[in-house]
A protein has these predicted regions:
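Conserved alpha/beta-hydrolase "acid-adjacent" motif
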Residues: 223-229
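Gly/Ala-rich beta-loop-alpha elbow adjacent to hydrolase catalytic centers
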Residues: 96, 100, 104
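Active-site loop/oxyanion-hole signature of alpha/beta-hydrolase fold enzymes
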Residues: 54-95, 262
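Conserved alpha/beta-hydrolase catalytic His-Asp/Glu region
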Residues: 151-197, 204-206
Length: 283
């Protein structure tokens, strides 16, 4: 299995699907391995066979080592940059969801030349500009590691990631994802290491320094990272497009299986055209 090693000795695992000339990096959220993406790489390749999809496991998840010490979101962004080095990729389109969106922001700020285009899903700039989740959602999130192996984990996860109307369909919507996290859950210490990094995350006014074409996606029913966070990001990243998905919660790719493929296709078209569009809201 391929790995890169960070300066602190942490080994970061990654995998690659496709052998095309257009690299796309998928970065997942808190406590999740790259297996979280399930059939998203297949859908991307079905849409565009010229893609090369890179899937890093964030430190502490999947086959990556748990970090030897506490770290920041920017540390994980540097990990992704090292993966790009190992893959001989100069620059890629980067898709990040939730914490993965925070990593993607830091990657675009710290390694500008490595990011050709950006898709930020269900994510936040952090305090003081971002909006906090409701306390009920935060409490549900913090009890997640202790619930994952239990039978009621499906409804526990659904209450956090899906609109209430979709709770009865949780197993159908997640389609194998719950089984995955029940059989190979993240270690609680690794989960809270990542959570500490998320709590310290902020990009603030620096977000205006992101210069690559950017699409920002949110669900209007996201109970974990309120849509106002995405609105703020889209208003301050030059030329960013905001996509608001009706009836969708935090688990955007689970509720809309093709949203990543659609958005990456639009992003590649924008970069290929070489034009910067004015911000607009797309329903």
């Amino acid at each position: 299995m391929p790995y890169v090693t960070s300066p602190d000795g942490c080994r970061i695992h990654y995998s690659v699907q496709g052998a095309g000339s257009t690299p796309v990096v998928l970065v997942q959220g808190l406590g999740l391995s790259s297996r979280f993406w399930f059939d998203v790489p297949d859908r991307l390749l079905a849409e565009n066979s010229d893609l090369r999809i890179v899937l890093p496991d964030n430190r502490g998840t999947g086959f990556s080592d748990r970090s030897p010490k506490l770290f920041r979101v920017r540390t994980m962004a540097d990990d992704v940059a090292r993966v790009l080095d190992a893959c001989d990729i100069d620059a890629a389109h980067v898709v990040g969801i939730s914490m993965g969106g925070m990593i993607a922001q830091q990657l675009a700020l710290r390694h500008k030349s490595r990011v050709k285009g950006l898709v930020l899903m269900a994510t936040t700039p952090g305090l003081p500009y971002g909006r906090l989740p409701p306390m009920k959602s935060l409490a549900t999130l913090l009890t997640m590691p202790s619930k994952l192996r239990k039978e009621e984990s499906a409804i526990h996860i659904a209450k956090l990631l899906l609109p209430e109307a979709e709770w009865p369909r949780a197993r159908e919507i997640f389609d194998g994802w719950i089984d995955l996290i029940q059989t190979s859950p993240v270690e609680p210490r690794a989960f809270f290491d990542q959570f500490a990094a998320v709590c310290a995350h902020w990009t603030g006014k620096e977000i205006a320094d992101i210069s690559c074409p950017t699409h920002v996606i949110t669900g209007d029913s996201d109970a974990l990272i309120p849509p106002k966070n995405s609105e703020w990001l889209s208003q301050r990243i030059p030329g960013a497009e905001l996509h608001v998905l009706a009836g969708v919660g935090h688990a955007i790719p689970a509720q809309d299986r093709d949203v990543v493929a659609r958005t990456v296709s639009r992003l590649i078209a924008r970069v290929g055209g070489g034009t910067a569009e004015a911000p607009r809201k797309v329903a």
